[in-house]
Amino acid sequence: MSTDSEMSEDMTLWEVLNEMRLEEELCDVVLRVDEVEFKVHKIILCANSPYFRSLFIRWSSLDQKVYTMTTVSPDIMAIIIHYIYTQEIRVTTDNVQAVLVMADYLLMRDLVHDCYDFLKAHLSPENCLGIWQYADTYSFRKLQDWAYSYTLRHFEDVVRSPSSEFLELNEEQLGGILERDELNVKQEKTAFEALIMWVEHEPDIRIQHIANLLLKVRLALIDLEYFLENIKTHPLVSSSWECQPIILRTLKAMFYINEFAHNTGYPDPLARPRLPYSILFAVGGFSRRSATNIVETYNSRMDTWKCISSREESVRAYHGTVFLDGFVYVIGGFDGTECFKSVCKFNPLDRTWNEVSPMTSRRCYVSVAILDGYIYAMGGFNGRERLNTAERYQPSTNQWSLIPSMHEVRSDASATTLLGKIYICGGFNGDECLFTAECFDPRYNQWTQIERMHVRRSGVGVIALNNQVSAMGGFDGAQRLQCLEAYNPRTNSWRMLASMFNPRSNFGVEVMDGRLYVVGGYSTEGTTSNCEYYDEESKDWFDVQDMNVFRSALSCCVISGLPNITDYTIAYDDFL
Protein backbone atom coordinates (compact mmCIF):
# COMPACT_ATOMS: atom_id res chain seq x y z
CA MET A 1 0.00 0.00 0.00
CA SER A 2 1.35 3.43 -0.93
CA THR A 3 2.00 5.96 1.79
CA ASP A 4 1.09 9.60 1.52
CA SER A 5 4.76 10.48 1.20
CA GLU A 6 5.08 8.18 -1.79
CA MET A 7 2.38 10.10 -3.62
CA SER A 8 4.24 13.04 -5.06
CA GLU A 9 2.65 16.43 -4.77
CA ASP A 10 3.36 16.81 -8.47
CA MET A 11 1.08 13.91 -9.44
CA THR A 12 -2.03 14.80 -11.38
CA LEU A 13 -5.47 13.58 -10.40
CA TRP A 14 -5.36 11.01 -13.20
CA GLU A 15 -1.99 9.73 -12.03
CA VAL A 16 -3.28 9.37 -8.46
CA LEU A 17 -6.37 7.48 -9.60
CA ASN A 18 -4.36 5.16 -11.82
CA GLU A 19 -1.89 4.44 -9.04
CA MET A 20 -4.76 3.60 -6.73
CA ARG A 21 -6.05 1.16 -9.35
CA LEU A 22 -2.65 -0.46 -9.81
CA GLU A 23 -2.24 -0.74 -6.04
CA GLU A 24 -5.83 -2.05 -5.77
CA GLU A 25 -6.74 0.67 -3.29
CA LEU A 26 -10.49 1.16 -2.64
CA CYS A 27 -11.39 -0.90 -5.72
CA ASP A 28 -15.01 -1.97 -5.44
CA VAL A 29 -15.68 -3.99 -8.58
CA VAL A 30 -13.97 -6.62 -10.73
CA LEU A 31 -14.21 -6.91 -14.51
CA ARG A 32 -13.50 -10.47 -15.62
CA VAL A 33 -12.35 -11.00 -19.20
CA ASP A 34 -11.62 -14.65 -19.98
CA GLU A 35 -9.31 -15.63 -17.11
CA VAL A 36 -8.05 -12.10 -16.45
CA GLU A 37 -9.48 -9.91 -13.69
CA PHE A 38 -9.34 -6.11 -13.60
CA LYS A 39 -9.97 -4.49 -10.21
CA VAL A 40 -11.40 -1.03 -10.73
CA HIS A 41 -13.55 1.69 -9.17
CA LYS A 42 -17.21 1.90 -10.13
CA ILE A 43 -17.35 5.67 -9.88
CA ILE A 44 -14.41 6.13 -12.27
CA LEU A 45 -15.90 3.82 -14.89
CA CYS A 46 -19.32 5.45 -14.53
CA ALA A 47 -17.81 8.88 -15.08
CA ASN A 48 -16.22 7.79 -18.36
CA SER A 49 -18.75 5.39 -19.85
CA PRO A 50 -22.56 5.63 -20.02
CA TYR A 51 -22.55 1.87 -20.61
CA PHE A 52 -20.86 1.17 -17.27
CA ARG A 53 -23.16 3.68 -15.55
CA SER A 54 -26.20 1.75 -16.76
CA LEU A 55 -24.55 -1.61 -16.03
CA PHE A 56 -23.75 -0.78 -12.42
CA ILE A 57 -26.88 1.23 -11.56
CA ARG A 58 -29.75 -0.12 -13.68
CA TRP A 59 -28.85 -3.57 -14.93
CA SER A 60 -27.48 -5.22 -11.78
CA SER A 61 -27.84 -5.26 -8.04
CA LEU A 62 -25.85 -2.74 -6.04
CA ASP A 63 -23.99 -5.47 -4.15
CA GLN A 64 -22.72 -7.27 -7.29
CA LYS A 65 -18.92 -7.22 -7.30
CA VAL A 66 -17.86 -9.26 -10.36
CA TYR A 67 -18.89 -8.60 -13.95
CA THR A 68 -17.95 -10.84 -16.85
CA MET A 69 -17.20 -9.10 -20.16
CA THR A 70 -17.64 -11.44 -23.12
CA THR A 71 -17.30 -9.12 -26.11
CA VAL A 72 -13.67 -8.12 -25.65
CA SER A 73 -10.19 -9.60 -25.26
CA PRO A 74 -8.03 -8.99 -22.16
CA ASP A 75 -5.53 -6.93 -24.18
CA ILE A 76 -8.19 -4.57 -25.50
CA MET A 77 -9.85 -4.29 -22.09
CA ALA A 78 -6.48 -3.32 -20.60
CA ILE A 79 -6.15 -0.51 -23.16
CA ILE A 80 -9.68 0.70 -22.42
CA ILE A 81 -9.12 0.75 -18.66
CA HIS A 82 -5.77 2.47 -19.04
CA TYR A 83 -7.48 5.16 -21.12
CA ILE A 84 -10.27 5.59 -18.55
CA TYR A 85 -7.76 6.16 -15.77
CA THR A 86 -5.14 8.21 -17.64
CA GLN A 87 -6.84 9.68 -20.72
CA GLU A 88 -3.84 8.32 -22.63
CA ILE A 89 -4.53 6.26 -25.71
CA ARG A 90 -2.34 3.23 -26.40
CA VAL A 91 -3.53 2.17 -29.82
CA THR A 92 -1.52 0.87 -32.75
CA THR A 93 -2.40 0.00 -36.31
CA ASP A 94 -2.81 -3.59 -35.12
CA ASN A 95 -5.31 -2.98 -32.32
CA VAL A 96 -7.08 0.30 -33.12
CA GLN A 97 -10.02 -1.29 -34.90
CA ALA A 98 -10.75 -3.60 -31.97
CA VAL A 99 -10.36 -0.71 -29.52
CA LEU A 100 -12.76 1.42 -31.57
CA VAL A 101 -15.42 -1.29 -31.65
CA MET A 102 -15.22 -1.68 -27.87
CA ALA A 103 -15.13 2.08 -27.26
CA ASP A 104 -18.27 2.42 -29.34
CA TYR A 105 -19.92 -0.44 -27.42
CA LEU A 106 -19.06 1.26 -24.12
CA LEU A 107 -20.35 4.61 -25.47
CA MET A 108 -16.98 6.28 -24.82
CA ARG A 109 -17.34 9.17 -27.24
CA ASP A 110 -13.91 10.75 -26.65
CA LEU A 111 -12.08 7.47 -27.18
CA VAL A 112 -14.12 6.84 -30.32
CA HIS A 113 -13.03 10.21 -31.69
CA ASP A 114 -9.40 9.53 -30.74
CA CYS A 115 -9.54 6.23 -32.63
CA TYR A 116 -11.18 7.99 -35.59
CA ASP A 117 -8.36 10.53 -35.65
CA PHE A 118 -5.72 7.80 -35.40
CA LEU A 119 -7.20 5.87 -38.31
CA LYS A 120 -7.63 9.02 -40.39
CA ALA A 121 -3.98 9.94 -39.82
CA HIS A 122 -2.90 6.44 -40.87
CA LEU A 123 -5.01 6.13 -44.01
CA SER A 124 -2.94 4.87 -46.93
CA PRO A 125 -3.51 3.41 -50.41
CA GLU A 126 -2.94 -0.01 -48.87
CA ASN A 127 -5.55 0.18 -46.10
CA CYS A 128 -8.18 2.75 -47.12
CA LEU A 129 -10.54 0.24 -48.70
CA GLY A 130 -10.26 -2.08 -45.73
CA ILE A 131 -11.00 0.76 -43.33
CA TRP A 132 -13.91 1.89 -45.51
CA GLN A 133 -15.47 -1.57 -45.40
CA TYR A 134 -14.75 -1.96 -41.68
CA ALA A 135 -16.39 1.41 -40.98
CA ASP A 136 -19.40 0.42 -43.07
CA THR A 137 -19.77 -2.85 -41.13
CA TYR A 138 -19.89 -1.04 -37.78
CA SER A 139 -21.73 2.06 -39.04
CA PHE A 140 -18.88 4.45 -38.27
CA ARG A 141 -20.20 6.96 -40.80
CA LYS A 142 -17.66 9.74 -40.34
CA LEU A 143 -14.75 7.30 -40.62
CA GLN A 144 -16.44 5.66 -43.60
CA ASP A 145 -16.70 9.02 -45.37
CA TRP A 146 -13.04 9.82 -44.66
CA ALA A 147 -11.84 6.48 -45.99
CA TYR A 148 -14.06 6.72 -49.08
CA SER A 149 -12.90 10.25 -49.84
CA TYR A 150 -9.29 9.11 -49.43
CA THR A 151 -9.92 6.27 -51.87
CA LEU A 152 -11.36 8.64 -54.48
CA ARG A 153 -8.53 11.12 -53.97
CA HIS A 154 -5.73 8.51 -54.17
CA PHE A 155 -7.42 6.12 -56.59
CA GLU A 156 -4.40 5.71 -58.85
CA ASP A 157 -2.19 4.70 -55.91
CA VAL A 158 -4.89 2.40 -54.53
CA VAL A 159 -5.13 0.54 -57.83
CA ARG A 160 -1.34 0.25 -58.14
CA SER A 161 -0.82 -0.98 -54.57
CA PRO A 162 -0.38 -4.77 -54.50
CA SER A 163 -1.53 -4.91 -50.88
CA SER A 164 -4.73 -2.89 -51.28
CA GLU A 165 -8.10 -4.63 -51.35
CA PHE A 166 -9.12 -3.14 -54.69
CA LEU A 167 -9.45 -6.50 -56.45
CA GLU A 168 -11.73 -7.77 -53.69
CA LEU A 169 -14.39 -5.10 -54.24
CA ASN A 170 -17.76 -6.29 -55.44
CA GLU A 171 -19.41 -4.97 -58.59
CA GLU A 172 -21.62 -2.50 -56.74
CA GLN A 173 -18.69 -1.05 -54.77
CA LEU A 174 -16.48 -0.65 -57.84
CA GLY A 175 -19.32 0.87 -59.84
CA GLY A 176 -19.97 3.37 -57.07
CA ILE A 177 -16.35 4.47 -57.17
CA LEU A 178 -16.07 4.68 -60.96
CA GLU A 179 -19.21 6.76 -61.36
CA ARG A 180 -18.22 9.46 -58.87
CA ASP A 181 -17.43 12.91 -60.27
CA GLU A 182 -14.87 13.23 -57.45
CA LEU A 183 -12.78 10.28 -58.68
CA ASN A 184 -9.28 11.75 -58.99
CA VAL A 185 -7.63 10.40 -62.14
CA LYS A 186 -5.23 12.45 -64.23
CA GLN A 187 -6.31 10.55 -67.33
CA GLU A 188 -9.60 8.73 -67.76
CA LYS A 189 -7.83 5.69 -69.17
CA THR A 190 -6.75 4.94 -65.59
CA ALA A 191 -10.39 4.24 -64.69
CA PHE A 192 -10.73 1.88 -67.67
CA GLU A 193 -7.50 0.05 -66.84
CA ALA A 194 -8.65 -0.38 -63.24
CA LEU A 195 -11.93 -1.85 -64.47
CA ILE A 196 -10.13 -4.34 -66.72
CA MET A 197 -7.75 -5.32 -63.91
CA TRP A 198 -10.73 -6.00 -61.66
CA VAL A 199 -12.53 -8.14 -64.27
CA GLU A 200 -9.39 -10.12 -65.11
CA HIS A 201 -8.96 -11.05 -61.45
CA GLU A 202 -11.99 -13.38 -61.74
CA PRO A 203 -12.95 -13.22 -65.43
CA ASP A 204 -15.47 -16.06 -65.47
CA ILE A 205 -17.53 -14.44 -62.71
CA ARG A 206 -16.99 -10.77 -63.45
CA ILE A 207 -17.30 -10.63 -67.25
CA GLN A 208 -21.07 -10.32 -66.82
CA HIS A 209 -20.55 -6.90 -65.20
CA ILE A 210 -18.24 -5.35 -67.79
CA ALA A 211 -20.87 -3.45 -69.79
CA ASN A 212 -22.51 -1.94 -66.72
CA LEU A 213 -19.13 -0.88 -65.32
CA LEU A 214 -17.91 0.42 -68.68
CA LEU A 215 -20.78 2.91 -68.60
CA LYS A 216 -19.28 4.38 -65.42
CA VAL A 217 -16.06 5.33 -67.23
CA ARG A 218 -15.97 8.69 -69.03
CA LEU A 219 -14.87 6.96 -72.23
CA ALA A 220 -15.35 9.99 -74.50
CA LEU A 221 -12.64 11.85 -72.57
CA ILE A 222 -9.99 9.27 -73.47
CA ASP A 223 -7.52 9.88 -76.27
CA LEU A 224 -8.96 8.57 -79.55
CA GLU A 225 -5.85 6.60 -80.48
CA TYR A 226 -5.76 4.89 -77.10
CA PHE A 227 -9.50 4.20 -77.31
CA LEU A 228 -9.22 2.51 -80.71
CA GLU A 229 -6.11 0.50 -79.86
CA ASN A 230 -6.79 -0.48 -76.26
CA ILE A 231 -10.52 -0.29 -75.54
CA LYS A 232 -12.51 -0.89 -78.72
CA THR A 233 -10.39 -3.94 -79.58
CA HIS A 234 -9.83 -5.25 -76.06
CA PRO A 235 -10.91 -8.92 -75.96
CA LEU A 236 -13.13 -8.44 -72.92
CA VAL A 237 -14.89 -5.52 -74.63
CA SER A 238 -15.05 -6.73 -78.23
CA SER A 239 -16.40 -10.13 -77.15
CA SER A 240 -19.32 -8.56 -75.26
CA TRP A 241 -22.36 -7.72 -77.38
CA GLU A 242 -23.56 -5.45 -74.57
CA CYS A 243 -20.43 -3.30 -74.95
CA GLN A 244 -20.88 -2.59 -78.66
CA PRO A 245 -23.57 0.13 -78.27
CA ILE A 246 -21.33 1.78 -75.67
CA ILE A 247 -18.46 1.85 -78.17
CA LEU A 248 -20.69 3.50 -80.78
CA ARG A 249 -21.97 6.05 -78.25
CA THR A 250 -18.40 6.88 -77.31
CA LEU A 251 -17.29 7.42 -80.90
CA LYS A 252 -20.29 9.68 -81.50
CA ALA A 253 -19.41 11.74 -78.44
CA MET A 254 -15.76 11.91 -79.49
CA PHE A 255 -16.79 13.15 -82.93
CA TYR A 256 -18.84 15.94 -81.34
CA ILE A 257 -16.00 16.95 -79.03
CA ASN A 258 -13.53 16.95 -81.91
CA GLU A 259 -15.83 19.02 -84.12
CA PHE A 260 -16.47 21.66 -81.48
CA ALA A 261 -12.98 21.43 -79.94
CA HIS A 262 -14.33 21.03 -76.41
CA ASN A 263 -16.11 18.50 -74.22
CA THR A 264 -18.53 21.01 -72.75
CA GLY A 265 -22.11 20.94 -73.89
CA TYR A 266 -22.42 17.30 -74.94
CA PRO A 267 -25.28 15.68 -72.98
CA ASP A 268 -23.87 12.19 -72.48
CA PRO A 269 -22.46 10.89 -69.17
CA LEU A 270 -19.64 9.28 -71.16
CA ALA A 271 -18.38 12.81 -71.90
CA ARG A 272 -18.96 14.31 -68.46
CA PRO A 273 -15.71 15.65 -66.95
CA ARG A 274 -14.89 14.69 -63.40
CA LEU A 275 -14.38 17.28 -60.69
CA PRO A 276 -10.77 18.31 -60.13
CA TYR A 277 -9.10 17.57 -56.81
CA SER A 278 -6.85 20.60 -57.23
CA ILE A 279 -7.59 24.09 -58.53
CA LEU A 280 -5.08 26.62 -59.88
CA PHE A 281 -5.64 30.19 -58.70
CA ALA A 282 -4.29 33.09 -60.82
CA VAL A 283 -4.34 36.27 -58.75
CA GLY A 284 -4.03 39.93 -59.76
CA GLY A 285 -1.48 41.31 -62.20
CA PHE A 286 -1.37 43.98 -64.88
CA SER A 287 -4.17 44.06 -67.44
CA ARG A 288 -5.00 46.83 -69.91
CA ARG A 289 -2.07 48.88 -68.58
CA SER A 290 -3.29 48.93 -65.00
CA ALA A 291 -3.13 46.73 -61.92
CA THR A 292 -6.11 44.44 -61.37
CA ASN A 293 -7.70 42.40 -58.60
CA ILE A 294 -9.01 39.76 -60.99
CA VAL A 295 -8.83 36.19 -59.69
CA GLU A 296 -9.38 33.28 -62.06
CA THR A 297 -9.42 29.58 -61.26
CA TYR A 298 -8.41 26.82 -63.66
CA ASN A 299 -10.14 23.44 -63.81
CA SER A 300 -7.80 20.97 -65.50
CA ARG A 301 -10.54 18.35 -65.94
CA MET A 302 -12.65 20.67 -68.10
CA ASP A 303 -9.80 22.89 -69.32
CA THR A 304 -11.76 25.99 -68.31
CA TRP A 305 -11.14 29.21 -66.40
CA LYS A 306 -13.65 30.82 -64.07
CA CYS A 307 -13.55 34.40 -62.77
CA ILE A 308 -14.15 34.61 -59.00
CA SER A 309 -13.05 38.21 -58.48
CA SER A 310 -14.16 40.13 -55.42
CA ARG A 311 -14.30 43.88 -54.94
CA GLU A 312 -13.03 43.37 -51.39
CA GLU A 313 -9.45 42.83 -52.52
CA SER A 314 -7.30 45.76 -53.66
CA VAL A 315 -5.61 45.73 -57.05
CA ARG A 316 -2.10 44.24 -57.06
CA ALA A 317 0.62 43.39 -59.53
CA TYR A 318 4.18 42.11 -59.07
CA HIS A 319 3.11 40.46 -55.80
CA GLY A 320 3.52 36.97 -54.39
CA THR A 321 0.82 34.38 -53.70
CA VAL A 322 0.98 31.23 -51.56
CA PHE A 323 -1.50 28.79 -50.03
CA LEU A 324 -0.90 27.80 -46.42
CA ASP A 325 -3.08 26.18 -43.75
CA GLY A 326 -6.36 26.84 -45.52
CA PHE A 327 -5.71 30.41 -46.68
CA VAL A 328 -4.43 32.12 -49.84
CA TYR A 329 -1.94 34.84 -48.88
CA VAL A 330 -1.28 37.74 -51.27
CA ILE A 331 1.97 39.45 -50.36
CA GLY A 332 3.31 42.87 -51.28
CA GLY A 333 3.03 44.12 -54.84
CA PHE A 334 2.23 47.35 -56.64
CA ASP A 335 -1.02 49.13 -57.56
CA GLY A 336 0.45 51.37 -60.26
CA THR A 337 1.34 54.09 -57.78
CA GLU A 338 2.49 52.58 -54.50
CA CYS A 339 4.64 49.61 -53.49
CA PHE A 340 2.93 47.56 -50.78
CA LYS A 341 4.08 46.05 -47.53
CA SER A 342 0.53 44.88 -46.84
CA VAL A 343 -0.54 41.23 -46.85
CA CYS A 344 -4.07 39.92 -47.36
CA LYS A 345 -5.43 36.44 -46.91
CA PHE A 346 -8.36 34.81 -48.67
CA ASN A 347 -10.52 32.11 -47.13
CA PRO A 348 -11.65 29.84 -49.99
CA LEU A 349 -14.40 28.30 -47.86
CA ASP A 350 -16.39 31.50 -47.34
CA ARG A 351 -14.65 33.62 -50.03
CA THR A 352 -13.72 36.45 -47.66
CA TRP A 353 -10.60 38.64 -47.60
CA ASN A 354 -8.83 39.90 -44.48
CA GLU A 355 -5.62 41.83 -43.88
CA VAL A 356 -2.91 40.35 -41.69
CA SER A 357 0.25 41.89 -40.28
CA PRO A 358 2.25 43.82 -42.91
CA MET A 359 5.85 43.04 -43.82
CA THR A 360 8.67 45.09 -42.35
CA SER A 361 9.50 46.45 -45.83
CA ARG A 362 7.57 47.46 -48.91
CA ARG A 363 8.15 44.86 -51.60
CA CYS A 364 6.94 44.69 -55.17
CA TYR A 365 8.67 42.35 -57.65
CA VAL A 366 8.87 40.16 -54.53
CA SER A 367 9.73 36.45 -54.40
CA VAL A 368 7.78 34.25 -51.99
CA ALA A 369 7.86 30.66 -50.77
CA ILE A 370 6.54 28.54 -47.91
CA LEU A 371 8.61 26.23 -45.71
CA ASP A 372 7.83 24.53 -42.39
CA GLY A 373 4.70 26.59 -41.79
CA TYR A 374 6.35 29.96 -42.52
CA ILE A 375 5.81 32.33 -45.45
CA TYR A 376 9.06 33.78 -46.79
CA ALA A 377 9.26 37.08 -48.68
CA MET A 378 12.59 37.90 -50.33
CA GLY A 379 14.08 40.78 -52.25
CA GLY A 380 11.94 43.04 -54.40
CA PHE A 381 11.74 46.80 -54.86
CA ASN A 382 10.54 49.23 -52.17
CA GLY A 383 9.93 52.21 -54.45
CA ARG A 384 13.46 53.56 -54.04
CA GLU A 385 15.87 50.65 -54.31
CA ARG A 386 16.20 46.95 -55.04
CA LEU A 387 16.48 44.76 -51.95
CA ASN A 388 18.51 41.83 -50.71
CA THR A 389 16.65 41.64 -47.40
CA ALA A 390 14.34 38.76 -46.53
CA GLU A 391 11.74 38.08 -43.86
CA ARG A 392 9.29 35.40 -42.85
CA TYR A 393 5.76 35.32 -41.48
CA GLN A 394 4.38 32.99 -38.81
CA PRO A 395 0.58 32.73 -39.11
CA SER A 396 0.09 31.52 -35.53
CA THR A 397 1.60 34.74 -34.12
CA ASN A 398 0.68 37.01 -37.04
CA GLN A 399 4.21 38.41 -37.04
CA TRP A 400 6.97 39.00 -39.57
CA SER A 401 10.62 38.67 -38.59
CA LEU A 402 13.79 39.37 -40.54
CA ILE A 403 16.10 36.56 -41.60
CA PRO A 404 19.66 37.00 -42.94
CA SER A 405 19.92 38.99 -46.16
CA MET A 406 20.67 37.31 -49.46
CA HIS A 407 24.09 37.53 -51.06
CA GLU A 408 22.72 39.62 -53.92
CA VAL A 409 20.16 42.34 -54.44
CA ARG A 410 17.23 40.84 -56.37
CA SER A 411 13.92 42.09 -57.64
CA ASP A 412 11.90 40.26 -60.30
CA ALA A 413 13.40 36.94 -59.19
CA SER A 414 11.40 33.83 -58.31
CA ALA A 415 11.63 31.30 -55.48
CA THR A 416 10.55 27.79 -54.57
CA THR A 417 11.00 25.20 -51.83
CA LEU A 418 12.76 21.87 -52.29
CA LEU A 419 13.99 19.31 -49.76
CA GLY A 420 13.86 21.64 -46.78
CA LYS A 421 15.52 24.62 -48.47
CA ILE A 422 14.37 27.75 -50.29
CA TYR A 423 15.86 28.42 -53.72
CA ILE A 424 15.75 31.85 -55.36
CA CYS A 425 16.96 32.36 -58.91
CA GLY A 426 17.61 35.19 -61.34
CA GLY A 427 16.09 38.63 -61.06
CA PHE A 428 17.32 42.18 -61.63
CA ASN A 429 19.74 44.13 -59.45
CA GLY A 430 19.10 47.57 -60.92
CA ASP A 431 21.89 47.29 -63.47
CA GLU A 432 21.58 43.89 -65.12
CA CYS A 433 19.50 40.75 -65.33
CA LEU A 434 20.92 37.97 -63.18
CA PHE A 435 21.79 34.35 -63.78
CA THR A 436 22.91 33.77 -60.20
CA ALA A 437 20.97 31.69 -57.68
CA GLU A 438 21.19 30.91 -53.98
CA CYS A 439 19.42 28.83 -51.35
CA PHE A 440 18.42 29.38 -47.73
CA ASP A 441 18.72 26.60 -45.15
CA PRO A 442 16.64 27.39 -42.03
CA ARG A 443 18.59 24.83 -40.00
CA TYR A 444 21.69 27.00 -40.23
CA ASN A 445 19.88 30.29 -40.88
CA GLN A 446 22.11 31.14 -43.81
CA TRP A 447 22.16 31.67 -47.56
CA THR A 448 24.48 29.72 -49.86
CA GLN A 449 25.24 30.58 -53.46
CA ILE A 450 24.71 27.74 -55.93
CA GLU A 451 25.75 27.16 -59.53
CA ARG A 452 24.64 29.87 -61.96
CA MET A 453 21.92 29.27 -64.51
CA HIS A 454 22.85 29.01 -68.17
CA VAL A 455 20.82 32.12 -69.01
CA ARG A 456 20.23 35.51 -67.38
CA ARG A 457 16.59 35.72 -66.31
CA SER A 458 14.56 38.60 -64.88
CA GLY A 459 10.82 38.04 -64.53
CA VAL A 460 11.65 34.33 -64.35
CA GLY A 461 9.39 31.54 -63.15
CA VAL A 462 10.89 29.10 -60.64
CA ILE A 463 9.20 25.99 -59.26
CA ALA A 464 10.18 22.62 -57.78
CA LEU A 465 9.38 19.59 -59.94
CA ASN A 466 10.56 16.01 -59.55
CA ASN A 467 13.19 16.89 -56.89
CA GLN A 468 14.73 19.55 -59.08
CA VAL A 469 14.43 23.34 -59.31
CA SER A 470 12.99 24.37 -62.66
CA ALA A 471 13.60 27.89 -64.02
CA MET A 472 11.88 29.02 -67.19
CA GLY A 473 11.19 32.08 -69.28
CA GLY A 474 12.07 35.59 -68.19
CA PHE A 475 13.92 38.46 -69.83
CA ASP A 476 17.68 38.38 -70.45
CA GLY A 477 18.09 42.11 -71.10
CA ALA A 478 17.43 41.81 -74.82
CA GLN A 479 14.51 39.43 -75.35
CA ARG A 480 11.80 37.37 -73.69
CA LEU A 481 12.80 33.75 -73.19
CA GLN A 482 11.06 30.44 -73.72
CA CYS A 483 13.81 28.08 -72.58
CA LEU A 484 13.59 25.89 -69.47
CA GLU A 485 16.44 24.60 -67.33
CA ALA A 486 16.50 22.42 -64.21
CA TYR A 487 18.86 22.44 -61.23
CA ASN A 488 19.89 19.22 -59.49
CA PRO A 489 20.89 19.91 -55.86
CA ARG A 490 22.86 16.66 -55.65
CA THR A 491 25.19 17.62 -58.48
CA ASN A 492 24.93 21.42 -58.14
CA SER A 493 24.37 21.67 -61.89
CA TRP A 494 21.81 22.94 -64.39
CA ARG A 495 20.64 21.22 -67.57
CA MET A 496 18.47 22.52 -70.39
CA LEU A 497 15.04 20.97 -71.00
CA ALA A 498 12.35 21.43 -73.65
CA SER A 499 11.44 25.06 -74.31
CA MET A 500 7.96 26.52 -73.87
CA PHE A 501 5.88 27.19 -76.97
CA ASN A 502 5.85 30.90 -76.22
CA PRO A 503 8.48 33.24 -74.77
CA ARG A 504 7.25 35.08 -71.68
CA SER A 505 8.31 36.94 -68.56
CA ASN A 506 6.47 37.99 -65.38
CA PHE A 507 4.03 35.10 -65.57
CA GLY A 508 2.42 32.76 -63.06
CA VAL A 509 3.92 29.32 -62.46
CA GLU A 510 2.72 26.35 -60.41
CA VAL A 511 2.76 22.55 -60.33
CA MET A 512 -0.60 20.78 -60.30
CA ASP A 513 -1.26 17.07 -60.81
CA GLY A 514 2.43 16.60 -61.57
CA ARG A 515 2.32 19.11 -64.43
CA LEU A 516 4.18 22.41 -64.55
CA TYR A 517 1.80 25.21 -65.58
CA VAL A 518 2.82 28.64 -66.87
CA VAL A 519 0.09 31.26 -66.99
CA GLY A 520 -0.11 34.60 -68.80
CA GLY A 521 2.80 37.01 -68.59
CA TYR A 522 4.48 39.39 -70.97
CA SER A 523 5.36 37.95 -74.39
CA THR A 524 6.99 39.33 -77.50
CA GLU A 525 3.61 40.77 -78.53
CA GLY A 526 2.71 42.22 -75.14
CA THR A 527 0.56 41.03 -72.27
CA THR A 528 -0.86 37.57 -72.93
CA SER A 529 -3.59 35.27 -71.65
CA ASN A 530 -1.86 32.21 -73.08
CA CYS A 531 -1.23 29.18 -70.85
CA GLU A 532 0.64 25.92 -71.29
CA TYR A 533 1.98 23.05 -69.21
CA TYR A 534 5.08 20.84 -69.16
CA ASP A 535 4.61 17.12 -68.66
CA GLU A 536 7.52 15.47 -66.86
CA GLU A 537 6.79 12.01 -68.27
CA SER A 538 6.72 12.98 -71.94
CA LYS A 539 9.20 15.88 -71.53
CA ASP A 540 6.92 17.96 -73.76
CA TRP A 541 4.82 21.13 -73.50
CA PHE A 542 1.08 21.22 -74.18
CA ASP A 543 -1.37 24.08 -74.75
CA VAL A 544 -4.24 24.67 -72.35
CA GLN A 545 -7.18 27.03 -72.49
CA ASP A 546 -6.29 30.73 -72.38
CA MET A 547 -7.35 32.79 -69.38
CA ASN A 548 -10.34 35.06 -69.85
CA VAL A 549 -8.15 38.13 -69.25
CA PHE A 550 -4.78 39.18 -70.69
CA ARG A 551 -2.44 39.54 -67.70
CA SER A 552 1.20 39.90 -66.73
CA ALA A 553 2.78 40.37 -63.28
CA LEU A 554 0.28 37.91 -61.80
CA SER A 555 0.95 35.21 -59.22
CA CYS A 556 -0.43 31.69 -58.80
CA CYS A 557 -1.07 29.05 -56.18
CA VAL A 558 -2.77 25.65 -56.07
CA ILE A 559 -5.45 24.56 -53.60
CA SER A 560 -6.32 20.88 -53.18
CA GLY A 561 -9.17 19.08 -51.51
CA LEU A 562 -11.62 21.95 -51.14
CA PRO A 563 -15.01 20.69 -49.93
CA ASN A 564 -16.63 23.49 -51.97
CA ILE A 565 -14.60 22.85 -55.11
CA THR A 566 -17.66 23.49 -57.28
CA ASP A 567 -17.57 27.16 -56.23
CA TYR A 568 -14.39 27.47 -58.28
CA THR A 569 -15.37 25.50 -61.37
CA ILE A 570 -17.80 26.11 -64.20
CA ALA A 571 -20.53 23.51 -63.78
CA TYR A 572 -20.67 21.05 -66.66
CA ASP A 573 -24.46 21.18 -66.55
CA ASP A 574 -24.32 24.91 -67.30
CA PHE A 575 -23.19 24.04 -70.82
CA LEU A 576 -26.08 21.67 -71.52
Language-model features, listed with the residues they occupy:
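Generic hydrophobic, aliphatic-rich segments that mediate packing or membrane embedding
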Residues: 13, 48, 65, 76-77, ...
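Amphipathic alpha-helical interface elements that mediate macromolecular binding in regulatory proteins
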Residues: 11, 50, 74-78, 82, ...
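Short Pro/Gly-enriched beta-strand edge/turn motifs at strand-loop
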Residues: 9-14, 513
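Canonical BTB/POZ domain core
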Residues: 19-127, 164, 170-202
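Cytosolic, low-complexity regulatory segments enriched in Ser/Pro/Gly with interspersed Lys/Arg
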Residues: 1-10
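Alpha-helical protein-protein interaction/assembly modules
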Residues: 95-97, 111-276
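Alpha-helix initiation and capping sites
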Residues: 73, 92, 108, 124-125, ...
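Kelch-like beta-propeller repeat domains
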Residues: 68, 208-576
